[in-house]
A protein has these predicted regions:
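Bacterial Sec-dependent N-terminal signal peptides
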Residues: 1-27
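N-terminal ligand-binding lobe of clamshell/alpha-beta domains
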Residues: 20-380
């Protein structure tokens, strides 16, 4: 009997111990599974592992038939064999060439603008900080986006070229890769969520070994954006809004799921084309726009126009809109850098909180007494 009792205790102990080990292993496995650190951006994934990150760009351009995966690897770290097929980038970067002005603020926010060695068409850059680097020759002009100077890029030998494509046919990207240059295809411009665009700062945090700083900065932007939304939450979206201007006999309005439409929604305004499905813009004839928006309370115009007189000269029919008659026309594209670059194009994707506050000040100025626009200007 004693023998049977001892055997029973042994069997029970065995199952308890193995059960505990199984649960313990399961818990460890759960805590060790790396997670995507991206919350808002729909076209970017960053999964952090020990010594390396797997970065995936899933929607690089409209109707893309491919996605791009990159391994950001720290020095002396061995990447698993299953990931060897992907492009490997050694981080942190010591030098970089970027090809969109939207990338410049991310570099400056992370204090790595001194790592920038080249940019196409440097006149487009508005930031005073980076302009100083350009003026002293630290940042070279490397051609134009559609025709980068490959010989100069080879001579510069940056650790990485961060660029973008516009469709499935990208001969310039192919030429860069054939030349032995390391290329990263980014797609912040494809994001339609205001916070989604801004979250691409985390990519640059990963490239320069500043993940914590990038997260801290982005979290502050999210908080600022959400606070602005709460400020206006009790307001009724009664102000009707017209968007856009004529371009070669076509009026392009922002679609209802676009970046611009999202700002107007969050600012509690009644955008007249909010029900137009899709992202990007829709070309309409003037008559159709006039019929729908003649009595709109506000008009967000496109272009760097400075005054109502200048605006009227562009198209005399603009004066038929109530927003023109009542002097309620604003543009976000009127402020230019020292060499003609548009500040809004450069800075707004990384600071959606400032864009939203500008919109709120247009539609609900009582909420922000004494506020000065960051981007917007009123046409007088």
């Amino acid at each position: 009997m004693k023998h049977l009792f001892s055997q029973s205790i042994f069997i029970l102990s065995f199952f308890l111990l193995t059960g505990c080990k199984k649960n313990e292993t399961t818990e460890i496995a759960k805590t060790e599974i790396p997670q995507n650190t991206i919350e808002y951006a729909s076209g970017l994934s960053i999964v952090k592992h020990e010594g390396y990150s797997v970065v995936t760009v899933t929607n690089p351009w409209p109707n893309a038939n491919k996605k791009f995966t990159y391994i950001l690897k720290e020095k002396d770290v061995k990447v698993p064999d299953s990931l060897q097929k992907y492009s490997t980038i050694k981080v942190p970067l010591e030098s970089v060439v970027v090809t969109s002005t939207t990338n410049i603020p991310f570099l400056e926010m992370l204090d790595v603008e001194d790592k920038l060695t080249g940019f196409p068409h440097t006149d487009y850059v508005s930031s005073e900080k980076t302009r100083k680097l350009i003026d002293k020759g630290a940042v070279k002009n490397v051609g134009q986006n559609e025709k980068l100077n490959i010989e100069q890029l080879i001579e510069l030998a940056p650790d990485l070229i961060v660029t973008f494509g516009v469709d499935n046919n990208n001969p310039m990207l192919d030429n860069l890769k054939k030349s032995g240059l390391n290329v990263f295809i980014q797609a912040d411009w494809m994001e339609q969520s205001p916070l989604g665009k801004a979250e691409w700062i985390k990519l640059y945090g990963a490239l320069f070994g500043k993940e914590d700083k990038a997260k801290e900065l982005f979290d502050k932007i999210v908080l600022s954006y959400e606070q602005a939304k709460k400020m206006v939450a009790a307001k009724q979206a009664t102000s009707t809004v017209l968007y856009g201007s004529m371009y070669e006999d076509v009026w392009y309005v922002a679609k209802g799921n676009s970046w611009v439409a999202q700002f107007m929604k969050d600012a509690r305004a009644n955008y007249l084309w909010a029900d137009l499905k899709g992202t990007g813009s829709e070309g309409l004839p003037f008559e159709k726009v006039l019929d729908k928006a003649k009595n709109a309370n506000f008009w967000i115009a496109t272009g760097s126009v400075k005054s109502l007189d200048e605006f009227a000269k562009m198209n005399p029919h603009y004066s038929e809109f109530d927003a023109f008659k009542n002097k309620r026309i604003y543009t976000f594209e009127g402020k230019l850098g020292a060499t003609g670059g548009t500040i809004y194009y450069e800075l707004s994707p990384s600071r959606p909180d400032l864009v939203l506050k500008d919109y709120i000040n247009i539609f609900h100025p009582d909420l922000l007494p004494g506020y000065e626009f960051t981007f917007a200007t009123k046409l007088n």
